[in-house]
Amino acid sequence: CSSDLIKERENSHNLQSSDAFNYWSQLHSDLAAKFDKEIEIDISDLLPQVSWGTSPEMTIAFNADIPKTSNSKKALNYMGLENEKNLLNIEFDKVFIGSCTNSRIEDLRAAAAAIKGRQKAASIKEVLIVPGSRSVQKQAELEGLDIIFKDAGFSWRDPGCSMCLGMNEDKLAPYERCASTRSEE
């Protein structure tokens, strides 16, 4: 239930006591509602996904081979990849941790815990850390997460548009590869 998800979030007490939350809580399906179809999908065996192409449907499990399809030649050429190449053998130039929707404080805490005491690999040109909002940035700095990232050789950025949109200096050069995070819920 969405309201349960909200209750798990920090500072949700402000939202839960709001008029908006009270109104939203009244919006639900009728108990006798009938739907055309209800489906349940078990994704417990789904592996992390990566994109090998230029469109969302060009996505496979991180350890899979790039499929050989008739419509992939143009995308593969653009990406500098080949059919049936395993993505585990692809080297990255940059890493991007962030985005306005996927750089919550809990995401940054998890990233900091994973890299604390480690260094950016010499083969990686740059690692960008972009907090999802100013409040996330402030909280991360209060907790010292920015120091962990900087000590690892990462770039700590201000929140805002970054590599997702590529409208500033946070862009990839042709044929550069970037590992970026997503934590869709």
Located regions from the model:
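Short, small-residue-biased leader/transition segments that mark boundaries at the very start
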Residues: C1-S2
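Generic, well-ordered alpha-helical scaffold segments in large soluble proteins
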Residues: L5, R9, A111-A114, R118, ...
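Glycine-rich loop at the start of a catalytic domain that most often binds anionic cofactors/ligands
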Residues: R9-E10, E141
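Short low-complexity, flexible loop/linker segments enriched in glycine and/or proline
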Residues: E10-S12, K171-P174
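A glycine- and small/hydrophobic-rich beta-loop-beta segment
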Residues: N14-G132, A140
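Pocket-edge structural micro-motifs
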Residues: I43, D158, S180-T181
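Cytosolic catalytic domains that perform sulfur/thiol-centered chemistry
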Residues: L47, T59, D151-G153, P174-E184
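Extended C-terminal subregions enriched in glycine
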Residues: K120-K171, R177
